[in-house]
Each structure stands twice: as structure tokens, then as C-alpha cells.
Amino acid sequence: MAAHVPTEVRTPSQRAGDAAEDEVGRRLLALGWALLGRRVRAGRSELDLVATDPGPPRSLVVVEVRWRRSRNFGLPEETVDRRKLVHLRAGVGRLLEAGRLPDGTDLPDLPVRLDLVAVEPPARQGEPLRFRHHRGIG
């Protein structure tokens, strides 16, 4: 998997996002996905997860993970606006142009998709985290 920024230099908010990315990665693996990279640098963009979805159809997927501690300021999905989508698409384009991850791993020749996974704390203590997977957001 691709190298990533060491957690010891990340802010508490970034570490919470890292934990959400870890959990999303575990869930995708449990669904048969293959994780190719985490926090992948593509130009000025950082792509949260790069994976292959076994399909059908089998696809190369860039996954944006959005985390919120509560709904007080809206849903995690609401943080992905048009500007963020443009930034993500540009990062995906740079990654595809390179044809490989920063660690040298070649990208598979597959259809490409951009997904969003929203993560929220449980509604009540003791319940699991809540996940919503939005496929093909842009």
C-alpha cells in the first residue's frame, strides 16, 4: 500500500478522519475489495482510499471518506460541494495520468469511479458507527 503521512504529525481532527478511513477500509476489504493505497498524493490532492471493487463491473475506485462527530453542523455528505468535487476529479485525473501509485504500484486498467463514504457516530452509545456509501458521485 502507498506510504502515508505519519499520524504523529496529524491534528486530532485528522486522526479522527484517519480512524474513519481505517474503518471504511476494513469494511471494503470485508466486501471483497482490494485496497491499493491510502492517503495517496496526486499532485496537490490527497485521495483517501484507492481500491478495486470486484463488481460487477470490476472497477478502480477512489473513495472520499467524510466524517462528522455529530449532525450539529450537517451531514458528512454536505461537506462535499462542487469545489471539492472539482478538486477530487483533478486528483483522480493526475493519478490516472501517472498510471501508478506514488509507491510504484501500477493501476489496473479498469473503469474508474469516484465514491463517497459518510461516517457518523452511533445514534446511541454502544451502537456501531453509521456508514453511507454513495457510488459514482462524480
Question: Model segments located where?
Answer:
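Acidic-basic catalytic patches of nuclease active cores, encompassing PD-(D/E)XK
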Residues: 1-38
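Short, low-complexity, intrinsically disordered N-terminal peptides in bacterial proteins
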Residues: 1-15, 56-57, 105-108, 123-125
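Catalytic cores of nucleic-acid endonucleases
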Residues: 3-4, 66-122
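Mixed-charge, glycine-accented linear interaction segment located at domain edges/termini
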Residues: 40-42
